[in-house]
């Protein structure tokens, strides 16, 4: 009996794209394809998708950007070839190719086919090139790569950085499928803390629901101290009052370790809780070490309410060292009221 291997059409076409690239022994091969919805770029290294901001090859995170323009595609990939081997991958979103080079241009190709080819290339490439190839794959339109990315995240034969990048990209899909996959990765005790932590952080999206917060809270008692820090980070991104109240309760819980309480306080301050929640927290801190840490956390807010409380701590805390810490952070403020307060102290 002769066995016949039947490949899915997308796999066959991806191989076809690979053969076209392999025909170029030396030089640059480039091609273009449609970008997934919600993705845009500046035509160079900066890309935005939803709340995620990426500056290739090293910056991956969430927040706002000051991009002057953001083009909704297409995705442009350039592959460097030398002696019949691929030596580089580069990807841009938006913009257009230079007409001055002698690159082999394959034109517009199928986005799913390009994604399959590039996903395979990411697993085979070195550190820098794998980052570009994986990004180029997930930028593609008309293909769901969440299952593939999850397999990559679980594959211990791949480099740790690539596995963590795969988890990050799962989080950018922002749908029920990706959320379920992140839950599965975060709760899988067979995975190392780096992968689980990446999944927890990826759940801390701008649109995270109260159900997401509740799920993270249920995970919290069963994870390591390192992963608890990741839970605090993720929960802090929620605007729900329940998230703020929970972080506050952890800070006030004297059954928790000092490190855990300090981390919960830090992320309460870094997150979206109103400053008034931080101000009220002070009265629950009996430990001097926590009150010292509190002055730093409060100093990061840089609003009127936070400065008022810092001044109050500097004047009235029972511990001299805590008062000095508060004074130090007041001295770092550029608020004119801080300068006035320091000047008044000196001239008394």
Put a short name on every predicted segment.
Residues 12-14:
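Boundary at the C-terminal end of the N-terminal hydrophobic targeting segment
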Residues 111-123, 142-154, 175-187, 197, ...:
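Amphipathic alpha-helical scaffolding segments comprising HEAT/armadillo-like alpha-solenoid repeats
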Residues 262-270, 276-283, 287-288, 292-295:
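Alpha-helical adaptor scaffolds
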């Amino acid at each position: 009996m002769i066995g016949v291997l039947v490949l899915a059409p997308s796999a066959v076409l991806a191989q076809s794209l690979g053969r076209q690239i392999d025909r170029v022994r030396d030089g640059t091969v480039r091609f273009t394809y449609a970008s997934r919805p919600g993705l845009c770029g500046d035509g160079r290294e900066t890309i935005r998708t939803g709340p995620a901001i990426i500056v290739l090859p090293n910056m991956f995170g969430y927040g706002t950007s000051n991009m002057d323009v953001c083009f909704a595609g297409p995705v442009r990939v350039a592959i460097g070839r030398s002696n019949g081997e691929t030596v580089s991958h580069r990807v841009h979103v938006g913009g257009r190719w230079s007409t001055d080079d002698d690159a082999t241009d394959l034109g517009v190709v199928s986005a799913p086919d390009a994604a399959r080819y590039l996903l395979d290339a990411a697993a085979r490439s070195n550190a820098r090139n794998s980052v570009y190839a994986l990004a180029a794959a997930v930028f593609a339109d008309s293909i769901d790569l969440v299952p593939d990315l999850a397999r990559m995240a679980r594959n211990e034969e791949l480099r740790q950085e690539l596995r963590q990048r795969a988890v990050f990209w799962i989080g950018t899909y922002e749908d029920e499928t990706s959320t379920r996959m992140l839950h599965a990765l975060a709760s899988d005790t067979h995975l190392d803390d780096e992968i689980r932590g990446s999944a927890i952080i990826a759940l801390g999206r701008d649109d995270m629901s109260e159900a997401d917060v509740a799920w993270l809270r249920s995970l919290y008692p069963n994870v390591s101290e390192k992963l608890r820090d990741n839970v605090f980070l993720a929960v802090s991104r929620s605007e729900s009052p329940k998230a703020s109240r929970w972080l506050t309760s952890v800070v006030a819980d004297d059954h928790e370790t000092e490190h855990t309480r300090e981390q919960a306080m830090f992320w309460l301050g870094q997150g979206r809780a109103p400053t008034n929640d931080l101000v009220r927290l002070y009265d629950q801190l009996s430990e001097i070490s926590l009150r010292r840490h509190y002055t730093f956390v409060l100093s990061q807010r840089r609003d009127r309410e936070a400065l008022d409380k810092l001044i109050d701590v500097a004047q009235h805390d029972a511990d001299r060292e805590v008062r000095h810490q508060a004074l130090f952070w007041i001295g770092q403020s550029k608020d004119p009221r801080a300068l006035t307060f320091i000047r008044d102290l000196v001239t008394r």
